[in-house]
UniProtKB/Swiss-Prot annotation:
It catalyses: L-seryl-[protein] + ATP = O-phospho-L-seryl-[protein] + ADP + H(+); L-threonyl-[protein] + ATP = O-phospho-L-threonyl-[protein] + ADP + H(+); L-tyrosyl-[protein] + ATP = O-phospho-L-tyrosyl-[protein] + ADP + H(+). This is MAP kinase kinase skh1/pek1. GO terms for molecular function: ATP binding; MAP kinase kinase activity; protein serine kinase activity; protein serine/threonine kinase activity; protein tyrosine kinase activity. It comes from Schizosaccharomyces pombe (strain 972 / ATCC 24843) (Fission yeast). InterPro entries: Kinase-like_dom_sf, MAP_kinase_kinase, Prot_kinase_dom, Protein_kinase_ATP_BS, Ser/Thr_kinase_AS. Keywords: ATP-binding, Kinase, Nucleotide-binding, Phosphoprotein, Serine/threonine-protein kinase, Transferase, Tyrosine-protein kinase. Residues 79-343 form the Protein kinase domain. GO terms for cellular component: cytoplasm; cytosol; division septum; nucleus. The gene is skh1.
């Protein structure tokens, strides 16, 4: 199997060597490292008018959708369901197109027992998501219930490069490693999204690789935020379990704060860097779920090790240590973390995320 190439970063950018990692060339490692930032805006969707003989509402653009219009499209067969984007315990996500148009979006379908009070509560929480307008937040277009199928449908922005979870597992399957430069851009994007949410008094609550999406141009976006997991479980009549990305204070039953999202970000970045979940140490026998939660609470936080052919910068290692501080009072919020030297460096360093993603998904 061919290995992913290593592209060297032009270090004539004025930043100290302390802030940049320079993985040594090692064909056996197959490290993925790309340069030059390209953050192009997403191409605007072509506006289309409703057909005269159509009785179903057809929007001119996706932002024109609302809950009622989405319900009409779902009920009257106005949506073409394309390929699956992901499956979970309580639902799925599919790529969709509005019939008669080229408008593409993602539809999340969640199991939903017929409980009117819970349905109304969840729709209220989802309206908060719709009000968010940030390049680092996935756009939400509308939500509706299909009581005949016991489903909640949520229409949202389609991100062509997929989730960080899918991206790093694709790199791993090809014998590669995701390098520090793409991780730096991802960290900046996630922190920018969290900072935006924090300004609006919203805590994400579920930062993990599958909830960090990237467009084909490399724009980082957060999804699935601000909605109570307990509410979703109650509505679906299921229990999806405790997320292993939860901060220790949350696993222990303590309150959730914005710094809890920072722990989850640190764990996510370390997982992608290592190509595996950081707990327990490599070589340990697979733990039972309750054992893993106990390990996260009671054992020291993981450290990012240096490996043959891979040199992580001291600044990146320090960033992860700050994120994974078990004392939540010492763990900063997203605005403070945006000032960390490692993140500040990657705010300006050019990393061609579009090319990185093209290589990841090329055959």
């Amino acid at each position: 199997m061919s290995k992913k190439p290593v592209l060297n970063l032009d270090t004539s950018n004025g930043f100290s060597e302390e802030y940049i990692s320079h993985p040594e060339r090692n064909d056996n490692q197959g490290i993925v490292e790309i340069t030059d930032l390209v953050f192009s805006s997403e191409s605007k969707l072509t506006q289309r008018k409703e057909s005269r003989d159509s009785k179903t509402f057809v929007p001119s653009f996706l932002e024109e959708l609302d809950d009622d219009h989405l319900h009409e499209l779902v009920t009257n067969g106005g949506i073409l369901y394309m390929n699956s984007l992901g499956e979970g315990v309580s639902g799925s996500v599919r790529k969709c197109r509005i019939r008669g148009t080229q408008m593409i979006f993602a539809m999340k379908t969640v199991l939903a027992a017929p409980n009117t009070a819970l349905q109304k509560q969840l729709l209220r929480e989802l309206k908060i998501n719709r009000s968010c307008t940030s390049p680092y937040i996935v756009k939400y277009y509308g939500a509706c219930y299909n009581n005949a199928e016991c489903q909640l449908n949520i229409a949202m922005e389609y991100c062509g490069a997929g989730s960080l979870d899918a991206i790093y597992k694709r790199v791993r399957s090809q014998g590669g490693r995701t390098g520090e430069r793409p991780l730096g851009k991802i960290a900046f994007g996630v922190l920018s999204g969290l900072s935006y949410l924090h300004d609006r008094k919203i805590i994400h609550r579920d930062i993990k690789p599958s909830n960090i999406l990237l467009t084909s141009k490399g724009q980082v976006k957060l999804c699935d935020f601000g909605v109570s997991g307990e509410l979703v479980n109650s509505l679906a009549g299921t229990f999806t379990g405790t997320s292993y990305y939860m901060a220790p204070e949350r696993i222990s039953g303590g309150s959730y704060t914005i710094s809890s999202d920072i722990w989850s970000l640190g764990l996510t970045l370390m997982e992608v860097a290592l190509n595996r979940f950081p707990f327990p140490p490599e070589g340990s026998p697979p733990p039972m779920p309750i054992e893993l939660l106990s390990y996260i609470i009671n054992m020291p936080p993981p450290l990012l090790p240096q490996e043959p052919g891979i040199k992580w910068s001291k600044s990146f290692q320090h960033f992860l240590c700050v994120c994974l501080d078990k004392d939540k009072t010492r763990r900063p919020g997203p605005q403070k973390m945006l000032t960390h030297p490692w993140v500040k460096a990657f705010e300006r360093i050019h990393v061609d995320m579009e090319e990185f993603l093209r290589q990841v998904w090329s055959d």
